[in-house]
Amino acid sequence: MMKFAFKIAYFGDNFHGSQFQPDQRTVEGEVINALRRLGVENPRLRSAGRTDAGVHAYGQVISFYSEDKIFPRMLNAELPEDITAWAWAKVSEDFDPRRAKSRVYTYVMYGSDYDISAMRKAVKELIGVHDFSNFTKKFGEGESCVREIISADIRADREFIIFEIEGNAFTWNMVRCIVTAIMEIGKQHRSIEWFRDLLNPEKHKERVEPAPPYGLILKDVKYDDVEFEIDDYAFKTLQSRIEDRIIYHGTIFKLFSLFRQSGIS
């Protein structure tokens, strides 16, 4: 029996999250079904992390067991088009995708009327070790929400604001809640001092609601001791599927922009 790790990408629109649920369409559910069609009856699938309904991924990592060698292109032949495996590694028995060195998320916000300078100041406050209790849905009573943020950056890109954050781990909804707070500062509804207070939940308790899921992507999951090999054919498949999405959504974006200009919408 061999153990493999795959990098997978998925478009989250039509999934009830990544974690397996018996009566819902999920990423893990589709992967398990695909592996079974390849003859892997008990894959013991694990993922690096859970993404909520509507959240996308480019570099999610899964692990599974198989008696036969399986390549990403083989799995893709059994997967729906909104999930694509594109890199792989044979890993040791003790490899656990959850024990990653870090995870990288990107969130895209629409709009150009934000105070980007104020948002940058807020983002800098995230670096280091903090208690993110105000930015999370609690997993359970007494569970720690202390996490280390390695890097965080925000920039304007035409009509969009791009926020990228890397940390050792993230709590439930943490990135989306941070985005909500940063947007409040960008709209000048809140101050940097308020943001600093949110990072000190012992003195200031205030639940921040998460931003919409559709702007969030799990960009990468990093490990010290795993070298992934890209499956060229599978990667080209992924690039083609991304290009199809860009064409479709870019066309819809332009279409409704014209509606707005003409007063139809």
Swiss-Prot record:
The active site is at 52 (nucleophile). GO terms for molecular function: RNA binding; tRNA pseudouridine(38-40) synthase activity. Pfam families: PseudoU_synth_1 (PF01416). Substrate binds at residue 105. One of its GO terms (biological process) is tRNA pseudouridine synthesis. SUPFAM superfamilies: Pseudouridine synthase. It is an enzyme of class 5 (isomerase). The keyword Membrane does not apply. InterPro entries: PsdUridine_synth_cat_dom_sf, PsdUridine_synth_TruA, PsdUridine_synth_TruA_a/b_dom, PsdUridine_synth_TruA_C, TruA/RsuA/RluB/E/F_N. Its EC number is 5.4.99.12. It catalyses: uridine(38/39/40) in tRNA = pseudouridine(38/39/40) in tRNA. Keywords: Isomerase, tRNA processing. Disulfide bonds: none annotated. Belongs to the tRNA pseudouridine synthase TruA family. HAMAP family: TruA. This is tRNA pseudouridine synthase A. It comes from Archaeoglobus fulgidus (strain ATCC 49558 / DSM 4304 / JCM 9628 / NBRC 100126 / VC-16). The lineage of its organism: Archaea, Methanobacteriati, Methanobacteriota, Archaeoglobi, Archaeoglobales. The gene is truA.
